[in-house]
Regions:
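Alpha/beta-hydrolase fold catalytic core
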Residues: 1-29, 51-54, 85, 92, ...
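Active-site loop/oxyanion-hole signature of alpha/beta-hydrolase fold enzymes
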Residues: 12-13, 20, 58-100
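Conserved alpha/beta-hydrolase "acid-adjacent" motif
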Residues: 222-228
Length: 245
């Protein structure tokens, strides 16, 4: 699952991050991955989007992928402010569309609420930050989190295979295994998970946004169940698409 796109590195606020930025001088679209993800999480999406004459931007969030994992609290506030700084660094300060999955959706929503950068469209894919703070996760989510305790590549791949609808490629499992071994990676993972669950739920505040919001959720999503889509149903600025499995 190696990215075929040219990657760049930048040092922002003392943290080295990896990112891609292609088709500059066009309408920008930012991809924000979820917990444990990276640029490669979007491999099957970036290609088709690139052909639509859009500027495609994606980054490894601090603490994930091949970006640095300093010893800090990986709060939603930290991430939203950092991503805005990243966009400013690469020259994006105008209307932008954001596509965020899980944790990435929660970060994108925070950016929209704070309005630090003009966001015209926000696509939320099974976003975190919606279930109540009392939500302790599903068996599937807890199974996913067990990758942190995997002692070998084979054990990690078995965990991923048990969560997937089909076979998991060795190349994909290897990326996750190797990156979890990077200094500070597991600590960053745990911090981001805890901070995500502690953050304010964003569904009420996002109603005030002028951005167009699209919510995608899998009917059989076992990580963050479909029932948590309910707050969006009543929002006039939201369109909802339920994906059949």
């Amino acid at each position: 699952m190696k990215s075929s796109l040219d990657v760049n590195y930048a040092r922002i606020n003392g943290i080295n991050i990896r990112y891609i930025d292609q088709n500059q001088n066009r309408e920008p679209v930012l991809f924000i991955h979820g917990l444990g993800g990276s640029i490669e999480s979007w491999n099957y999406n970036i290609g088709p989007m690139s052909s639509r004459n859009l500027r495609i931007v994606a980054l490894d969030l601090p603490g994930f992928g091949l970006s640095d994992s300093p010893k800090i609290n990986y709060s939603i506030n930290f991430y939203s402010e950092y991503v805005v700084k990243f966009l400013q660094t690469i020259g994006i300060d105008r209307n932008i569309s954001i596509i965020g999955s899980s944790l990435g959706g929660q970060i994108g929503a925070e950016m929209v609420i704070k309005n630090n950068v003009p966001v015209t469209k926000l696509v939320l894919i099974s976003p975190a930050g919606v279930p109540p703070r009392s939500f302790k996760g599903t068996p599937t989510l807890r199974r996913y989190l067990s990758i942190l305790q995997a002692k070998s590549f084979e054990e990690l791949k078995n965990i991923l295979t048990s969560l997937a609808d089909g076979p998991v490629k060795d190349s994909y499992a290897k990326i996750i295994f190797e990156r979890l071994l990077r200094p500070g990676a597991k600590e960053a993972f745990v911090s981001a998970l805890k901070e995500s669950s502690r953050a304010l739920r964003f569904t009420k505040n996002i109603r005030k946004s002028s951005a167009k919001i699209f919510v995608l959720w899998g009917r059989e999503d076992k990580m963050i169940p479909l029932k948590f889509i309910r707050p969006f149903v009543r929002q006039s600025n939201c369109r909802i698409l339920i994906i059949e499995h």
